[in-house]
Amino acid sequence: MDKPKAYCRLFLPSFLLLSACTVDISQPDPSATAVDAEAKTWAVKFQHQSSFTEQSIKEITAPDLKPGDLLFSSSLGVTSFGIRVFSTSSVSHVAIFLGDNNVAEATGAGVQIVSLKKAMKHSDKLFVLRVPDLTPQQATDITAFANKIKDSGYNYRGIVEFIPFMVTRQMCSLNPFSEDFRQQCVSGLAKAQLSSVGEGDKKSWFCSEFVTDAFAKAGHPLTLAQSGWISPADLMHMRIGDVSAFKPETQLQYVGHLKPGIYIKAGRFVGLTR
């Protein structure tokens, strides 16, 4: 075995753990013919940690939004930075656009409905992913759920438990050859480390937990995993072209950026993004 290949096999698992980079490596199609060289190659797909999966981004405005759109954001504050570090992601918060310039979210103040303007003001970067087959009735049901639990508390206990879970779950990325193994591994760790609250007993939510429950209540679950296991980054990775830790029930579509954020602006300045 030549040295480059040996080094690659030796350091790849360590690299994946330290970088928390989830990878899917698919075997070649056994039914492909020998002349089908492209089908015979291994397909390697890396998890995208940035807010966009391609090199270029699309800037949008409020009229481009639809009820039920997911608003992913980050800020320049210490809390946002800490969440992004532990989740190895570019996002720290997720909310739902309800229409009529209203946004439903769970923050330290609890579950609340605020204006889109306020949500944008508190964010450095804000981009939108969409559930492509969401019906108007399901969007209405999401709004009804948000109004029903409005002013509920914030799930601080869930957040405290989530911090060590975000660290230990990175071990599940060490086997890039099995998507099923990764999902079973993460689910197993979640069952062992995170508390489980009965549906009727829930009195508080954190942001991604609220979003996951809202879609489930509307009859359009984003994932069948328990809502208390899901982080903003997990929802972001359920988009088309990405690699998700939990199996998505539907793949989210990138709509665009309402606010590019300081890092994307800097990337544009030096020519890294368009």
From Swiss-Prot:
EC number: 3.4.-.-
GO cellular component, one term: plasma membrane
Residues with a covalently attached lipid (N-palmitoyl cysteine): C21
Residues linked to a lipid group, S-diacylglycerol cysteine type: C21
Secretion signal span: 1-20
Annotated compartments: Cell inner membrane
Enzyme class: hydrolase
InterPro entries recorded: Papain-like_cys_pep_sf, Peptidase_C92
Keyword Protease appears in the UniProt entry: yes
Active site: C207 (nucleophile), H257 (proton acceptor)
Cysteines paired by S-S bonds: none
Keywords of the record: Cell inner membrane, Cell membrane, Hydrolase, Lipoprotein, Membrane, Palmitate, Protease, Signal, Thiol protease
Record SUPFAM superfamilies: Cysteine proteinases
Coiled-coil region list: none
GO terms classed as biological process: proteolysis
Pfam families referenced in this protein's UniProt entry, alphabetically: Peptidase_C92 (PF05708)
GO molecular function: cysteine-type peptidase activity
Membrane topology field: Lipid-anchor
Family matches, as Gene3D superfamilies: endopeptidase domain like (from Nostoc punctiforme)
The protein's name in its UniProt record: Probable lipoprotein peptidase YaeF
Species of origin: Escherichia coli (strain K12)
Gene designation per UniProt: yaeF
